[in-house]
Amino acid sequence: MIEIQNLTKVFQEQTVLQNINATFDAGLIHGVIGKNGAGKTVLLRLLCGLMHPSKGQVIVDGKQLGKDVDFAPDAGIIIETPCFLPYLSGFQNLKELASIRNIISKEEIAEAMEQVKLDPSSRKHVGKYSLGMRQRLGIAQ
């Protein structure tokens, strides 16, 4: 479960999000929709622990992001156009990202790719992937 309590984010003097409160139950898929500049990406970054709030808190499974844990290990975001290093294979991209999270098991990376129907042994560079393949790689991430 993810709980948002009085979440506010201010950049310089501009308030992007103000006093957001919500609860997201575990096991469900949620989406965020809104106009350009509404703060959707900022909210998602806050929910994953990729950014810290100016005020308020995000609680994931009873643990406060930024206090009890630095990031939400079981949460992720898939953006419309995922960004990967185009000159590396899908496996190499995931390996680079996994090293940031101290995941060194090649088997875990290969399993994540297989779950989204991508071949971990393929040497095909991500720059040659279709948008759908890049989005599936984003899910594996």
Predicted regions and their residues:
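Conserved structural motif at the start of ABC-family nucleotide-binding domains
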Residues: 2, 17-19
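Short coil-to-beta microelement around the adenine-binding A-loop and adjacent beta1/P-loop entry
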Residues: 14-15, 69
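The feature captures the beta-strand-to-loop junction immediately N-terminal to the Walker
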Residues: 33-35
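Helix-to-loop junction immediately C-terminal to a conserved catalytic motif
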Residues: 48
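Conserved ABC transporter NBD signature motif
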Residues: 56-71
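Conserved ABC ATPase "signature" region
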Residues: 95, 106-121
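Hydrophobic anchor residue at the start of the ABC signature
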Residues: 139
